[in-house]
Structures are given as C-alpha cells and as structure tokens.
A protein has these predicted regions:
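Short, solvent-exposed loop/turn and secondary-structure capping segments
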Residues: 106-114, 200, 231-233, 267-268
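Gly/Ala-rich beta-loop-alpha elbow adjacent to hydrolase catalytic centers
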Residues: 190-194, 198
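Serine hydrolase/lipase
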Residues: 1-12, 156-187, 203-375
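N-terminal low-complexity, Ser/Thr- and acidic-residue-enriched intrinsically disordered segments
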Residues: 1-102
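A conserved cap/lid and substrate-binding interface adjacent to the catalytic center
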Residues: 59-186, 209-213, 217, 243, ...
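Active-site-proximal beta-strand/loop segments in catalytic clefts of secreted hydrolases
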Residues: 97-101, 192, 223-225, 259-260
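Short, glycine/acidic-rich beta->alpha junctions
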Residues: 69, 197, 229
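Intrinsic structural disorder/low-complexity segments
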Residues: 16, 25, 144, 148-151, ...
Length: 375
C-alpha cells in the first residue's frame, strides 16, 4: 500500500475488511477459517503495516440457518503497537470491527431481523450493567426517562459480546482478560449494520465494565448507521463517548458518519422536524417522476409503520455530515432510485474518506471456487 492513511482512514479500512464474507455461503467453520486466512494480508495491504488480528474472526448464524445462507454477523479485533492519532499522540490500539449485512438481498436474517426488526424494544440497562452481560429481556413498552433500543439491535449486540469464535473465548472475556499497555486505545467501528451495532456494543461493554482497562481511551467510529434507540440511549452514548474531532468531516470520533444523500441514517426517526428522519428519503435526489415517487412513498410508509409499532420515538445519535456526489439529474424510476441509494450508502463514503485508496473486496469468488472443488 503506497498511500499513507490517517488513523480514521485506517479504522475505516478495518471496518471494510470485516465485510469480506459478503454474500459468501458456507458453514460457520468454513467461513471463519477462510476469513481468518485472508485477514492478515488484508489488514497489511489496506490498513497498513503493523496491523494484525488479535481476536477472531467470529462468524454467527441464526438457529435454522443452512450452509447455503450467508453469515448473519462477522466481527474481529485488530491491534497495532503504535498508531498516530489526530492530536499527535502515538498509542497501542485495538479495533473491534463489525461487518455490515452480508446477505445480498432483503430476505436474509441480518436484513429482515437485525436491520429492520425495530417494532419491539427493550430497556437497555436490564441486560448490560454492573459487571455482567446477560441475554436481553423480552420486549416491553418503553418507559419515559429510560434508555431503550430495538430488541433486534440488542439481541445482535449481545451475540457480538457473548458468542465465541470456534476455539476461542467471547469478545467480552477477551477484553476482560487483556492487559493493555498504559494509554492503549480501544475503538469500535462498523458500516451500515455495523454502524448500528458498534455504538450499541460499545455502550453495553462499557456500562458492564468490560472496557474498564481502556477507561478514558475508548472511542467509537460508526459509519452510516441507522438509529439504534431513543433519545435517552443517545444521551447515554454521548455521556460515555463525548464527540471529539473536526466537525462535518470524517475525522471525528464518537459520532455517526453520515452522508446526507444516504437513506440508511434517516432510519428510524419519524419526527419531520429532525435533520435525519424517514420523511426525507423520497426527496434526497430531487423531484422524482410520479411512479417512482409513489413507490418511494409506499416504502417510507412501511418503514414508518415498523418504527411506530415500537411505541417509541427513535432518535439519531450525534452525527458528522459529509456529502456524496449528487446525481446529475433525478432518478427516472424506482430501479434508478435504488441504484443511487446503493451508491450513496457505500461507494460515496469510500470516495470521501479514502479518496483513491483501494479497498478490500469480497471473498465470494474464492468461496465459490473452494466449494466447487469439494463437490
């Protein structure tokens, strides 16, 4: 890798590396084995020399999933002995990187449940507090002045904390057992679904005491995540992780990195007065033709119904706004709208954050070759 990346760009690349199992179909053991084999070279090539795998990767599939389904969650921990931060300090650094949705359609478990299952919520501090992380409680009607998150998000965060990779220990136990050098930093990051789960997991592990060895040195770098919970959860997140860095750039910690033209960070707030809310989605790219407008309005109605079924007002986390390249003209039909959504949700972030730097790809073709060779 010839380009020198700043710390934010390196963390961004580590996040992208967690997505290498995108649309890969195999058993969890096969997936874990092939990701583990590819990660070391990937980290060096794209994030830079010195990065290595400290834990994982972990691969999780829901009960009933087959080998012909992609993984539901992939996550790992990378470490570097000496990373230069934006303030000039040089610190040993651990990064928890969480994959985006790995299914290639909207029918996969991670899309349908973890991403869009927002109709039920749970009291966040009922499962993560006071030195313990337990299975999340059953959903309940939200109570004022308490932090609530989507049950689907909470269940996934619990999986990330408590599910062990084959042959290893759970992430929470790994962090508890670590003996980092003084001044070491711990960073949570992820894109899309990972952008929802990274702040949720960071809060859970922190309030439960599993990151105490990084007290004052834990950072979060979520990328284009939807809203995980209500205002009180957002306040809890901000209290634990105050924003720091340049406003309205990618160089800012503890805020959601948001492309103004990306629909995903507009989820799941329904308050039309908010900067980020579902009502914005049909208008992101100008005036649509009637058929496309009707189509998009119907989608937004369905999304609103999911959000309001929770009985709670979802509220975005603090964010840093960037702006992807605007389309030269409004999309002409629903297919073009979806294509623009896809571009603004992925490639636009790469261009703003990384410029011309290359990015990690999927192992899908490699998985296909290996599986064919075994037939």
């Amino acid at each position: 890798m010839s380009l020198k990346l700043d710390v934010f760009q390196q963390v961004y690349q580590l996040s992208l590396a967690s997505n290498m199992a995108q649309a890969c179909q195999a058993s969890p053991l096969e997936l874990q084995t092939m990701i583990a084999a590819a990660l070391p070279e990937t980290l060096t090539k794209y994030a830079g020399p010195g990065w290595e795998v400290a834990w994982g990767p972990a691969v999780w599939k829901h009960d009933g999933a087959t080998d012909e389904m992609p993984p539901d969650n992939v996550w790992y921990v990378a470490k570097h002995p000496a990373i230069e931060f934006e303030d000039g300090s040089i610190c040993p650094t651990y990064v928890v990187a969480i994959a985006a949705s790995t299914g290639d359609d909207f029918k996969s478990y991670d899309w349908l449940y973890e991403g869009f299952g927002v109709g039920q919520v749970v009291n966040f501090l009922e499962w993560a507090e006071g030195g313990r992380i337990v299975a999340p409680p059953v959903s309940s009607l939200p109570t004022s002045n308490l932090a609530y998150t989507a049950k689907s998000t909470t269940d996934a965060a619990y999986t990330l904390a408590a599910f062990p990779p084959l042959g290893s220990q759970p992430l929470k136990e790994f962090l508890k057992a670590l003996n980092p050098q003084p001044g070491s930093k711990l960073i949570f990051t992820g894109h899309s679904l990972g952008g929802i789960l990274s702040p949720t997991l960071a809060v859970a592990l922190t309030v439960a005491g599993f990151t105490r060895k990084f007290k004052g040195n834990t950072l979060v770098y979520p990328i284009c995540g939807a809203s995980p919970g209500n205002t009180h959860f957002g306040e809890l997140f901000q209290d634990l992780f105050p924003p720091r860095g340049d406003i309205s750039t990618y160089r800012r910690w503890n805020v959601n990195l948001v492309n103004e033209l990306d629909p995903v960070p507009q989820l799941w707030c329904v308050d039309p007065m908010g900067k980020l809310n579902l009502n914005n989605i049909p208008h992101l790219y100008g005036e649509l033709p009637q058929a496309a407008r009707i189509y998009m309005n119907s989608i937004v109605r369905c999304l609103k119904a999911r959000a309001t079924a929770s009985g709670m007002m979802y509220s975005p986390l603090r964010y840093s706004l960037i702006r992807g390249p605007e389309p030269s003209s409004p999309p002409k039909n629903a297919e073009e709208v979806i294509a623009e959504f896809t571009k603004q949700h992925s490639r636009a972030y790469n261009e703003v954050v990384l410029g011309s730097a290359p990015t990690p790809g999927s192992l899908r073709q490699r998985f296909t070759r290996v599986r064919r060779s075994r037939l």
